[in-house]
Amino acid sequence: MAMFLKSRGVRSCRDRRLLSDEEEETSQSSSYTLGSQASQSIQEEDVSDTDESDYSDEDEEIDLEEEYPSDEDPSEGSDSDPSWHPSDSDESDYSESDEDEATPGSQASRSSRVSPSTQQSSGLTPTPSFSRPRTRAPPRPPAPAPVRGRASAPPRPPAPVPQSTKDKVPNRPTRPVLRGPAPRRPPPPSSPNTYNKHMMETTPPIKGNNNYNWPWL
C-alpha cells in the first residue's frame, strides 16, 4: 500500500512538472508571437492591407483545425478547386471599414494581451525584440583641468645683431663752399739797390773798428 501511494505521488509530481513546462512554453510562444505582431504592426505603414486585427497565431491554428480535420488534405482548398470561393476564408467577413474601426480596439486588445504575458514571462526569459539595440554614445573626454600658476611671460624680442662701426662711417654733412675775393698777389721782390740805399740812409757810416761805430752793442 505504501509503495502504491509513493508511486502515485511520484506520478502526480511528474504530471505537475510536465504541466508547468507546457504552460511555460505556451506563455513564451504567446509572448513571442505577440511581440512579433506588435513590432510588425509598428513597421507596417498601411494597416488596412495586411492587418488581421483580432486573430493571433493560435486562433489561426484552431481555425485551420476546424476547417481541415486531420484526415483531409489542406491542399484541396487551393485556387485550382472551382468550388472554393473567397467567402470561405477567414478575412472575407471583414470589410475595409470594419478593419479601420477595429485597428484602435485591436491595438488596445494587443496591449492588454501583451501585458499579462510579459508579466508572466518577465521572470523567465525576456521577449525578443526586432528593433536595433541602441548603441551607447562614446564617453566624453575629460575636460582639461585649469592650470593654476603664473601666466606665461610673452616671448622676448630677438637681440639686435651687433654691427661693426669700422665698416660703416656715418655720413657727414657737406660743408658749403664759401667763395671770397681772389687772394692778392705777393709784392715783387725789392731790388738790392734799393735795399742798400735804405741801409745807407738809416745806418751811420762805419769807419774802422772803433767803439763808436757800434753803439748798439
From Swiss-Prot:
Residue spans of biased composition, Acidic residues class: 43-79, 89-102
Region feature Interaction with host H2A/H2B, mapped onto this chain: 81-84
Polar residues composition-biased segments: 32-42, 208-217
Residue ranges the record marks as coiled coil: none
Spans traversing the lipid bilayer: none
Cellular location(s): Virion tegument; Host nucleus; Host cytoplasm, Host perinuclear region
Bias kind Pro residues: ranges: 136-145
UniProt keyword annotations, A-Z: Chaperone, Host cytoplasm, Host nucleus, Virion, Virion tegument
Described function: Histone-binding protein that binds to histones H2A/H2B, H3/H4 and cellular chromatin to overcome the host DNA damage response triggered by the viral genome ends. Interferes with histone ubiquitination and recruitment of repair proteins.
UniProt comment concerning the protein's domains: Binds directly to histones through its N-terminal domain.
Subunit structure: Forms a complex with the host H3/H4 dimer and histone chaperone ASF1. Also forms a complex with host H2A/H2B dimer. Interacts (via C-terminus) with BGLF2; this interaction is important for infectious virion production.
Designated name of the protein: Tegument protein BKRF4
Taxonomic classification: Viruses, Duplodnaviria, Heunggongvirae, Peploviricota, Herviviricetes
